[in-house]
Amino acid sequence: MATWLAILLIVAALIIGLVGGFFLARKYMMDYLKKNPPINEEMLRMMMMQMGQKPSQKKINQMMTMMNKNMDQKMK
């Protein structure tokens, strides 16, 4: 009977470790992406120039605000 208990405890610890590791890694990545967004103002400016638009600071600020708001909604 002790063997079954040991196996059960090992499996339970493994599952708890996997779930805990998943959530810790998820939180770390969310914080990392918030501090280092995948796109910044300079990248937006270059994209707009490549599309033939004149990048005004107002447009860039609007796009960054929109992207940050969208990112915050996805994180919740």
Curated annotation (Swiss-Prot):
The keyword Ligase does not apply. The keyword Transmembrane applies. Its main location: membrane. It is a single-pass membrane protein. It comes from the Bacteria. Keywords: Cell membrane, Membrane, Transmembrane, Transmembrane helix. It is found in: Cell membrane. The chain crosses the membrane at residues 4-24. It holds the Pfam family UPF0154. GO terms for cellular component: plasma membrane. Belongs to the UPF0154 family. This is UPF0154 protein Sca_0984. It comes from Staphylococcus carnosus (strain TM300).
